[in-house]
């Protein structure tokens, strides 16, 4: 089991830890997370949080974790100086992305800094699927594994877009770590 100790080596009354996802349930089963329903009620978590987030913070119907942030990996990091040098604008669509990528490449900048580890490829693929197909398609194809969505023209477009994104990485990308 899990045992949290204070400075004196004995059990502690209070502790904080960054835990998320299924780990919240595991820690709660160990009995080391406090009931936070009073705080949740006072701060109106049930009204403010999406149900999926609220459910993940609860164990047996009680809040046992606080909603500190929601982290996504589908961010686009851009270098404004490189865009300025290339005469490109920050994209908001995939079509704009490819126009900008072409301009960056012509200006001598590698448009997509990307390693080739599996998790990086899948993260990029997820972002493309969401951007090309939208939230409903993403959920059907990648969460529910709906055969119709997986074999659809939208998935064909996702795959073609992903393949095109990869052409804007450098040849040394495969296997490179993210940092």
Report the location of each language-model feature.
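Extracytoplasmic/periplasmic solute-binding protein
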Residues: 59-68, 74, 98-147
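Short, solvent-exposed loop/beta-turn-alpha elements that line the ligand-binding surface or hinge
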Residues: 37-49, 132-157
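Glycine-centered hinge/linker elements that transmit conformational signals in sensory
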Residues: 101, 144-178
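Early extracytoplasmic/lumenal segment of secretory-pathway proteins
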Residues: 1-22
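Hinge/lid segment of periplasmic solute-binding proteins
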Residues: 20-74, 98
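Short helix-initiation/N-cap motifs at beta->coil->alpha
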Residues: 1-2, 94-99, 174-179
């Amino acid at each position: 089991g899990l045992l949290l100790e204070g400075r004196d080596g004995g059990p502690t009354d209070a502790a904080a830890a960054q835990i998320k996802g299924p780990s919240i349930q595991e820690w709660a089963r160990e009995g080391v997370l406090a009931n936070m329903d009073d705080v949740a009620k006072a701060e109106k978590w049930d009204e403010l949080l999406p149900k999926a987030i609220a459910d993940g913070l609860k164990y047996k119907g009680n809040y046992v974790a606080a909603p500190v942030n929601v982290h996504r990996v589908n961010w686009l990091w851009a270098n404004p100086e490189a865009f300025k040098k290339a005469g490109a604008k920050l994209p908001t669509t995939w079509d704009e992305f490819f126009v900008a990528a072409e301009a960056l490449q012509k200006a001598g900048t590698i448009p997509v800094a990307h390693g080739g580890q599996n998790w990086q490829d899948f993260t990029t693929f997820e972002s493309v699927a969401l951007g090309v197909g939208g939230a409903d398609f993403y959920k059907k194809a990648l969460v529910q594994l709906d055969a119709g969505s997986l074999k659809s023209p939208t998935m064909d477009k996702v795959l073609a877009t992903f393949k095109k994104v990869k052409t804007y990485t450098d040849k040394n990308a495969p296997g490179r770590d993210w940092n």
